[in-house]
């Protein structure tokens, strides 16, 4: 992991265009090829980023940029699309690299991990014709619990929680923003699934076009035998 604090401007060029004017920012260059641009606000969400696979090329700026104070130019090129992240660095304030090694990954709450496994095996609970793409679909901002396809072949990102609240909806929203930038997956819609979903979370999910599904954990485990009940 390389961490650079620099005065820089940033341009995203491709299917979308975005510009960040000159300011001091944190640049994260990860071993998987992803590059993320952070400010001192906005919580953990980057201002802009390039997802892996991608390549980073550092070059000397042209005469025009040199006159504007640019000392070096980073071009982060996506390997899948023509999208590029262009970072014009005016001054480096800090530059350090650390070998983090293999990360064991997020260890989920026991019930959440079991819900993920069970839903992957019973993906048809989300609707007729659903099929599993994979569990733990990794992105530059974290793993999507389950990626699936619906009966129409459209991509669906599923976020699983034991108790669904607003934070879970916000997390899924960030995943959807990122996944919909990938032409191989887009359009991607979201499903927020949990044993219990708070009313505020349902309202926010509905406002953002995200479906909510309440999961019966006991039934999924096969222990909810209604025929054996006395009452």
UniProtKB/Swiss-Prot annotation:
Subcellular location: Cytoplasm
Signal peptide, first to last residue: none
EC number: 3.1.-.-
Keywords: Cytoplasm, DNA-binding, Endonuclease, Hydrolase, Nuclease
Domain of life: Bacteria
PANTHER family named in the record: ENDONUCLEASE NUCS (PTHR38814:SF1)
Protein name: Endonuclease NucS
């Amino acid at each position: 992991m390389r961490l650079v604090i620099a005065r820089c401007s940033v341009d995203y060029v491709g299917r979308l265009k975005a510009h960040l004017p000159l300011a001091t920012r944190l640049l994260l260059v990860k071993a998987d090829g992803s590059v993320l641009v952070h400010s001192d606000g906005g919580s953990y969400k980057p201002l802009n980023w390039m997802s892996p696979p991608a390549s980073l090329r550092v070059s000397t700026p042209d005469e025009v940029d040199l006159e504007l104070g640019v000392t070096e130019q980073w071009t982060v090129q996506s390997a899948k699309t023509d999208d590029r992240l262009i970072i014009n660095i005016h001054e480096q304030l800090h530059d350090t690299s650390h070998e983090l090694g293999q990360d064991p990954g997020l260890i989920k709450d026991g019930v959440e991990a079991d819900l993920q496994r069970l839903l992957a095996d019973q993906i048809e609970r989300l609707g007729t014709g659903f099929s599993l793409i994979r569990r733990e679909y990794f992105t530059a901002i974290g793993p999507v619990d389950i990626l699936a396809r619906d009966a129409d072949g459209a991509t669906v990102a599923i976020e699983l929680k034991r108790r669904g609240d607003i934070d879970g909806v916000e997390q899924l929203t960030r995943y959807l923003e990122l996944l919909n930038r990938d032409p191989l997956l887009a359009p991607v819609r979201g499903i927020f699934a949990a044993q219990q979903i708070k009313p505020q979370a349902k309202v926010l999910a509905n406002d953002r076009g995200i479906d909510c599904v309440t999961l019966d954990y006991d039934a999924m485990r096969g222990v909810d035998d209604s025929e054996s009940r006395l009452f």
